[in-house]
Amino acid sequence: MKMLDLYGYTSIAQSFDKICISIASPESIRAMSYGEIKDISTTNYRTFKVEKGGLFCPKIFGPVNDDECLCGKYRKKRYRGVVCEKCGVEVTSSKVRRERMGHIELVSPVAHVWFLKSLPSRIGALLDMPLKLIENILYSGDFVVIDPIATPLSKGEVISESAYNQAKDNYGEDSFLALTGAEAIRELLVRLDLHAINANLRVELESTTSEMKRKKIVKRLRIVENFINSGNKPEWMILTVIPILPPDLRPLVSLENGRPAVSDLNHHYRTIINRNNRLGKLLKLNPPAIMIRNEKRMLQEAVDALFDSTRRSYVSNKAGSVGYKKSLSDMLKGKQGRFRQNLLGKRVDYSGRSVIVVGPNLKLHQCGLPKKMALELFKPFICSKLKMYGIVPTVKLANKMIQNEKPEVWDILDEVIHEHPILLNRAPTLHRLGIQAFDPVLIEGKAIQLHPLVCSAFNADFDGDQMAVHIPLSLEAQLEARILMMSTNNILSPSNGKPIIVPSKDIVLGIYYLTLQDQVQSEDEILFFGDFSHVEYALHNKDVHLCSQIKYRMTYCNYDTSDGKPSYYSKIIETTPGRLILWQIFPQHKNLTFDLINQVLTVKEITSIVDLVYRSCGQSETVEFSDKLMSLGFKYASQSGISFGCKDMIIPDTKTMHVDNASEKIKEFAVQYQDGLITRSERYNKVIDEWSKCTDLIAKDMMKAISVYDVESKLNSIYMMAHSGARGSASQMKQLAGMRGLMAKPSGEIIETPIISNFREGLNVFEYFNSTHGARKGLADTALKTANSGYLTRRLVDVAQDCIVVEYDCKTHNGFAIRSVVEGGTVVETLDNIILGRVAAVDVYNPITEELLVKAGELIDEAKVEKIKIAGLDAVKVRSPLTCEAKKGICALCYGRDLAIGDVVSIGEAVGVIAAQSVGEPGTQLTMRTFHVGGTAMRGVETSNLIALLDAKVKLVNSNIVEDKHGNKIVMSRSCEVVLLDSVGNEKMRHNVPYGARLYVDDGQLVKITEKIAEWDPYTMPIITEKTGIIKYMDLIDGVSINEVLDESTGISNRVVVDWKLHLQGANLRPRLVLIDDNDNIITLSNGLEANYFIPIGAVLNVQDGQKVHAGDVITRIPRDSIKTRDITGGLPRVIELFEARRPKEHAIVSDIDGYVEFGKDYYRSKRRIFIKPVSDTLSPVEYLVPKGKHTIVNEGDFVHKGDLLMDGDPDPHDILRVLGVEALANYMISEIQQVYRLQGVRIDNKHIEIILRQMLQKVEIFEPGDTMYLVGENIDMEEVIKTNDNMVKMGKSPAKYAPILQGITRASLDTNSFVSAASFQETTKVLTEAAFSGKEDSLYGLKENVIVGRLIPAGTGFLMNKIKKLSLLNKEDYSMYYNNEYQDSALLQNDNNAFNQELHKDTGNIVDY
């Protein structure tokens, strides 16, 4: 252990391997106690000494002052261990007052409020009595029959006091035993035979049929089994002894004015002691029963208040009310509780904070530290140096010297901070880049200087932000800070692997200006240069300008030569002096050619250049390059003199024309609406669309006008800022010089009158009011959503914190097939982007040449992605954290590349926390960003057609087509897809075409780019006839199932189907349209069913009774709701909903099997029955109930596949998991979550979401227990079930069958194996109650548990230390060799050193195995 102490291991935190929790028995409480307390006195009011025998008694709890007894007879260390014969106090350190406990012997037992009131009540469950009855026994004086002896009463029957007296009179005093209060409950609990109850419940469970009863029995059975297995006795839930906390944990402090400030706990203890003593005295006097009962009830209430005051029934003691006293539970719960305030977050010594200012002349690894701060922070270091050099003899003088700021002090400070990294942190620390290490540079002034490039990582700006400084003290801490946390080592973002140290704002503007090129009038103006020094000379003499067009002889290098030596050749290129200046700072590498920067560079290009430099030249080159890029950018941004005035906002001349055109169209819509051709919501949607189009057109024209190059004034300044990506965006420019456009109401609806003015013209009063209306919502949202997002991050971290990389390869061959992501026909995420940095699960071949591209188990890096791209593959099977088979964590290969480094993740990396931060961090940013567009409605025009984006061949899937009377092809299938194939036959795009769309192409037809393939009405859902015939109304009765709805503004009436169930005569109606032929016979459709069209509530009928219709005609239409704007405020709740795995409010029904749709003849409680008839006759049909008024998206006779939706709405993720399995669930969740983030332009790697999903899928539900002890419907940890099943198979018994279940992140965090982690998360009292009666053990696997008990976390450097610690506990002499670096890298990280692993997996006694 000596060696371990060197490595920062404290003996107390290391001296145990697990933590167990159980209910304290009266004996164990007495054993822990140092004496009983009977007196309530605290301190003497005159001498302020603590009273003997009181709540602070020194005889029981230990001396108040170090090594000094109360009376003062013994003082000095030499008397340690002596007990003073005068005052009875043991002479020892006063620290024992923090650990010695006392106790109170209760005269009458009381119930422990946690086991009584925490739902489900454990006492109630064991006794099988409702909580109300138990409360009546405890508080209201009801009696319970313990033993009926010779009376007809039954055991456990609760009788009132009057009934008790009556029974005594009837049957005699001793003919039965009935008690009241806690004694009665205790007596019942003592008499319980848990094993018998267990056996009976299992028998009962076999025979019961009711689901409710089953659940109740299972709950009770679990509690009984937990009691049996944990060794707790039920009667311990009733207290006969109460422990008293050590006095220094409930101190008595005197304030300045001499009044004492007392901890609330002391108040509770005084009440209990007073009531207990009073009850003791009363019992000796033999008073009336009512007095005793009252006194006992008061004692019970006092103890309840001590343990948990919030659970008490009367109001004066609710938290927050005057006179509320904090109970023990309150000290653990919530943000201010022990767990979150003191154990998970601690205040740190050697720290300071100050305002930050920009330090443009710093290097990337430096930060400016004010001298004053440095002097204070490094004071102890300076003191020791001053003493060491003999400048001062004592520390006291050294302090004085530092105070007077003598010159020697500054010299020593310089020496001390040399190469001593410091940590800078900016709150809120949303991801790991919120704390980074820098080398301090001493500066004058009082503000910390920060390097401009790290601002985006900290999310810092210089408008008054503050940052905190921390000093790593120990050598190991300095080492970790320098190697892992230095700002130069954090160039890539851990969430998406793109550089985060990228220029922004002014720097981008400077570089953009540097790479601009003037347009020349004639070829004669272009000058030739052969050397860069000539260019500089010409610039100096003002012969050329930075942006002038010149010709230059550029020397190129050819690296691919036969002899391996690079060869050089020259080439004349057209460029500008500015670009040549930029070229001078580039590092030399074959991937970095001049063509990269021989163009105008905007933010996007600059980012990709930094990325390329990192991938090609490595880290140190990138850091130098970034620093040079920054200084260039700043220099030329200031030289350019870019500024803008009002005239720079050019309003396009076409604006009035576009606005007039839109107004005309809107008048047309109004006329159509008044003529009854379109409904109100259709008109609204069309108006919104028209104005959106108009705004976009004006914006386009404005961008055209503003981006025109003018010889005199060169480029427009505003355009340069927006185009370069330095500041502002197209949408902000649109509002400045175009037209503000549509605004949203706080409810999210769009106001249909747009703001036609822009900010340059100024808004009129009406427009101004409209815009404040939406903008105010943005501000309110921000405030509310920040809290929501922070809470989401907290839950994510909690659920993922114990996911650590534990081994290199778990040897699995499972994985997911990954395809590119297509939304609305466009590829939003290409395949190469998604598979980069993943590991192939199977060998990947080129389909044409059959060349092996990637071996199974190999990392797919940039080079391999390029090969896959060339091969034209549309799917690749890769390994995923979801399919990883590692125990207690995941393996490096299933995770793939560590995005922050660009190589396979190292063992011990805390990937769970990184995933949680990556998903949570943008949430906070996005919510703060809602109002940046000023509340203008950001809504794309609804897609209503499908256009070919490339020349391709059309393939139609599931297309059931009819021709209407105009010869148009109408799609009748619900699952029609148009697939576009390239010349080789590879699928390039796949689109869903909705039911009722018009198709303009045939199967196998070749289409040209921009050709229209199909179009449809996005605002209504039609119902279309398949055959020609005559319409007949069935069950469509005026006033019952249809109403003429008169539109007041138009005077035209529509026939709308209403809820017929609300009408008396409507009970058995099934409103539908029937198609008949001329002989009144119902027409049969192609699938052999009759032509019945069932009409949902809210549909508008387009046909009259008896009207003749043609195939392909629309007979009814269902209007869709007007679309609300979607921003992350819609998005964040969506992300939360998905991660919490909540069932959507009106979720779509998913088909469980393949089969044909059949509509039931009757209704079930106003729900419509749908049957899916399976293809094979051996299976029975599955029935579904669709709520009334919901539109089913299938017709009678349609064939549906397993997993297809039967009605509108979002599917329930639980259904997807149950029907289609884990891979389909993962695809659904990832695409839904990514969609929300993509809307905001945030990139998150899929693997982060997969890790969170892995944590949500840890539990399984047992549906056949086999020979195991599990119960049907029980949720158990998957690893545990697999282990149990393995044992069962070995013993030749039948294993349990189970299905995976999806838990929300909150549920999953609370159900974790570690009760310490769960208790510190939420519902602390409930978690601890549950853990205590189950006798749970916490093996301290996760990060949180280890932080709480004060150990190194088992991740990163701590992961290695844990392995070494295990070996050292085995007392092996040779474990020191594991400190050898090369050995450590190869053996520990690759996990291939058999000897090492065998050593660990031997029988290690009480050692936890990782």
From Swiss-Prot:
Of the GO CC terms on this record, one is: DNA-directed RNA polymerase complex
Residues where Mg(2+) binds:
D461, D463, D465
Q: Which family does it belong to?
A: Belongs to the RNA polymerase beta' chain family.
Instruction: Output the Gene3D superfamilies linked to this UniProt entry.
Output: 1.10.132.30, 1.10.150.390, 1.10.1790.20, 1.10.40.90, 2.40.40.20, 2.40.50.100, RNA polymerase II, clamp domain, RNA polymerase Rpb1, domain 3
Q: What is its EC number?
A: 2.7.7.6
Quick one: which gene encodes this?
rpoC
Keyword Transmembrane helix attached: no
Checking SMART domains in the record gives: RPOLA_N
Origin superkingdom: Bacteria
Q: What does this protein do?
A: DNA-dependent RNA polymerase catalyzes the transcription of DNA into RNA using the four ribonucleoside triphosphates as substrates.
NCBIfam families, per the entry:
rpoC_TIGR (TIGR02386)
Q: Name the cofactor(s) required for activity, per the record.
A: Mg(2+); Zn(2+)
Record-annotated residues binding Zn(2+) 1? C69, C71, C84, C87
Disulfide bond annotation, renumbered to this chain: none
A GO BP term, please?
A: DNA-templated transcription
Q: Paste the cofactor note.
A: Binds 1 Mg(2+) ion per subunit. Binds 2 Zn(2+) ions per subunit.
This chain's protein is named DNA-directed RNA polymerase subunit beta'
Keyword list, A-Z: DNA-directed RNA polymerase, Magnesium, Metal-binding, Nucleotidyltransferase, Transcription, Transferase, Zinc
Which species does the entry assign this protein to? Ehrlichia chaffeensis (strain ATCC CRL-10679 / Arkansas)
Catalytic activity annotated for this protein? RNA(n) + a ribonucleoside 5'-triphosphate = RNA(n+1) + diphosphate
